[in-house]
Amino acid sequence: MAKKQSILSPIIRITFTFLVLCGLVYPLIVTGIAQAVMKDNADGSLIYNDKNEVIGSKLIGQNFTDPRYFHGRVSSIEYKAEASGSNNYAPSNPDLEKRVEKSIEEWKKQNPSVPVTEVPIDLVTNSGSGLDPDISPKAASVQVERISKITNIPKETLNQLIKDQTEGAALGLFGENRVNVLKLNLELQKLMK
C-alpha cells in the first residue's frame, strides 16, 4: 500500500503542475503578449461604428442584400459563424449546379445591365468556410453600375473607393488581391450621407 502511495503522489503533483502550467499560466502569458503586441487581432479584428458599437469583424463575412450596397460571396450557412463550413459539392454535383443557377438568377434580377459572362466566380460560389469576408476587386467592380444607378454616386467615385479598399496578397505573395465587403460598404455609407 505504501508503494502505491509513493507512486501516486508524484503522478498527482505532476498532473496538477502541468494542469496549472498548460491550463492557466501559458494561456495567460500568450493572451497578455497578444493583447500587448496585436490588440486588434487578439480581440477578433472587430469593426466599430461612429458610436463605438461593434458592427462586425474584418474576418467574418456578412449578408448584404440591400441593392445600394456591395454584396459578398454566397454563403450556404447564411454567415452563421457557429456553423462554419460548406457543402463542398463536387463540380459535377447537381445540387451545386442548382445553387449556382439560383445565384445567377438572383444576379440577373439585381444587375440586369451586366452580362452573366462578366460575373466573377466568387459572386456565385461560396468559400470553404461560408464566412469569407472578401471578394475580388473584379467582383466589386461589376456591382458599380447597379450601386451608382441607385445611389447617384458617380461610377468613378465608386471605382476609386474599390481601389482604395483593395488589399494586396499577404506579403505580396500569398493569395489574391481582395476587397473586404464590410469595410467597403462602411466607406460607401459615408458617401451616401
UniProtKB/Swiss-Prot annotation:
Stored Pfam families: KdpC (PF02669)
Membrane topology: Single-pass membrane protein
GO molecular function, one term: ATP binding
Any single GO CC term annotated in Swiss-Prot or TrEMBL for this entry: plasma membrane
Organism: Bacillus cereus (strain AH187)
Keyword Nucleotide-binding recorded: yes
PANTHER family: POTASSIUM-TRANSPORTING ATPASE C CHAIN, POTASSIUM-TRANSPORTING ATPASE KDPC SUBUNIT
Protein name per UniProt: Potassium-transporting ATPase KdpC subunit
Assembly, per entry: The system is composed of three essential subunits: KdpA, KdpB and KdpC.
Subcellular location: Cell membrane
InterPro entries for the chain: KdpC
Primary subcellular site in the record, as a coarse category: membrane
The encoding gene: kdpC
Function: Part of the high-affinity ATP-driven potassium transport (or Kdp) system, which catalyzes the hydrolysis of ATP coupled with the electrogenic transport of potassium into the cytoplasm. This subunit acts as a catalytic chaperone that increases the ATP-binding affinity of the ATP-hydrolyzing subunit KdpB by the formation of a transient KdpB/KdpC/ATP ternary complex.
Coiled-coil regions listed in the entry: none
Family membership: Belongs to the KdpC family.
Segments traversing the membrane: 14-34
Entry keyword set: ATP-binding, Cell membrane, Ion transport, Membrane, Nucleotide-binding, Potassium, Potassium transport, Transmembrane, Transmembrane helix, Transport
